[in-house]
UniProtKB/Swiss-Prot annotation:
Protein name: Transcription antitermination protein NusB
HAMAP family registered for this protein in UniProt: NusB (MF_00073)
Keyword Ion transport among UniProt keywords: no
Keywords from the named record: RNA-binding, Transcription, Transcription antitermination, Transcription regulation
Species of origin: Shewanella pealeana (strain ATCC 700345 / ANG-SQ1)
Length: 135
């Protein structure tokens, strides 16, 4: 498994979680849709599935971890940035094999690619505070 395969899995997971958040569709249906309708060449499919399923099943727990560091209600946070923060929080909490610097850097890069103009600063701020609290 190459790092680029995980990066592609994260990119696809952001898009899938964004879709799930907005549509309210069953996560299994969202997963199936993305795996059949998107280009998944070079994607770590197992990691994509873990991120998608993990964020969906642990959403409440992840949101409880995130909420203290957000200055507005979570439902007012940009859905792309919320998806990115949820993925990174999942990695920071449940994937101890992923160094926290990697999880944060990947989230920042995803926010630069998909988020609002200063979305990466928002994402970085939340994740830095989350890591500092959990050290």
């Amino acid at each position: 498994m190459k790092p680029s395969e995980r990066r592609k899995a994260r990119r696809l997971a952001v898009q899938a979680i964004y879709s799930w958040q907005l549509s309210g569709n069953n996560i299994a249906d969202v997963e199936h849709e993305f795996l059949t309708e998107q280009d998944v060449a070079g994607v770590d499919i197992a990691y994509f599935r873990e991120l998608l399923g993990g964020v969906a099943t642990k959403k409440s727990q992840l949101d409880e971890l995130i909420t203290p560091f957000v200055t507005r209600p979570l439902d007012e946070v940009d859905p792309v940035e919320k998806a990115i923060v949820r993925i990174a929080t999942y990695e920071l909490t449940f994937r101890k094999d992923v160094p926290y610097k990697v999880a944060i850097n990947e989230a920042i890069e995803l926010a630069k690619a998909f988020g609002a103009e200063d979305g990466h600063k928002f994402v970085n701020g939340i994740l830095d505070k989350l890591v500092a609290r959990n050290k």
